[in-house]
Amino acid sequence: MSFQRHKKHVISISLGSSERDAKATVVLGEQELLVERRGTDGDFAKARQLMEECDGKVDAIGLGGTDLFVYAGDTRYTFRESAKLIAKVRNTPVLDGSGLKNSLERRLIAKLAAEKIVDFKDKKVLLVCGVDRFGMAQALQEAGAKLTFGDLLFGLNVEKPLYSLESLAWWAKLLAPIVTKLPVSWLYPMGKEQQKRTPKFSKYFLENDVIAGDFHFIRKFMPESLLGKIIITNTVTESDCKMLKQAGVKLLITTTPCLNGRSFGTNVMEALLVAVKGAKSSLTAAEYIELLERYEIESSFEYLND
């Protein structure tokens, strides 16, 4: 029996580099989806224009290169600059990946531990930014990892590593009302800055066994050698994989699956799942997990060096 696939369109509009643009066709069940990523090289006006042009013409929009929200304990703060990007989008759901991160990444860490792919017990883990991956942070702690959070190191250029979820939550509650009003570019590499390497606070990379979190932070600040390290991240291209291999990375784990030779950002995957569901807003954690399991969407593992 044949069927007519219902084609849907998901687009991620990113403040990141246009050099990382990609396009892929994905089939989930009986639905075919065109998934694409378009970077604006840090141009907020262009990103806002693209958002408004796509409103009502695609099934879901991913917001990349920035976060819309950050969480401090149970309080959610909105990045003022990011909110302006989507202020006039009325008809198409916009997803920044935060809704999916908690469920997808928590599930991944539990799976890695359960299947003994990575034994986190007493393993030293650097999470380059914990506030945008609190679910991953909690899962790592539950798995027995010894955590170092790089939020102040890499986000604010302050040499103060944090070593517990409690201290991370305390600092987040103190600083979130302030930093969410600052230009995003002060906190996060975007546009051409994503392609520049400026190693910083290298000792925290070197003294940890696992480096986890946002790849743009990892790529920008990592030292030349990461011999024997495990990287848990997302949004890597083929050239990124080659760079990590040359750096001596042992195992690369991407939280999102590879499509056409690269892993897309969490915002893309969240938008894809919302589009498949036909929803007009973000889903619940249970709904995300159900869709991930139904369509057998799995993370990617690649041993780069023996």
Regions found by a protein language model. Give the residues of each.
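Short, charged/polar "capping" segments at the starts of alpha-helices
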Residues: S18-A22, V70, G135-M136, N157, ...
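Active-site rim beta-loop-alpha module in soluble metabolic enzymes
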Residues: N157-F217
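Short, charged, surface-exposed secondary-structure boundary motifs
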Residues: L156-Y163, D240-A247, G261-V268
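Conserved beta-alpha
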Residues: L100-Y163
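Metallocofactor- and cofactor-centric catalytic cores in central/energy metabolism, strongly enriched
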Residues: S2-D122, A143, A212-G213, L227-T235, ...
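Short, polar loop motifs at secondary-structure junctions
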Residues: T66, G130-R133, F215-I218, T235-S239
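Short, T/G/N/S-enriched strand-turn elements that build extracellular solenoid repeat scaffolds
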Residues: F221-E224
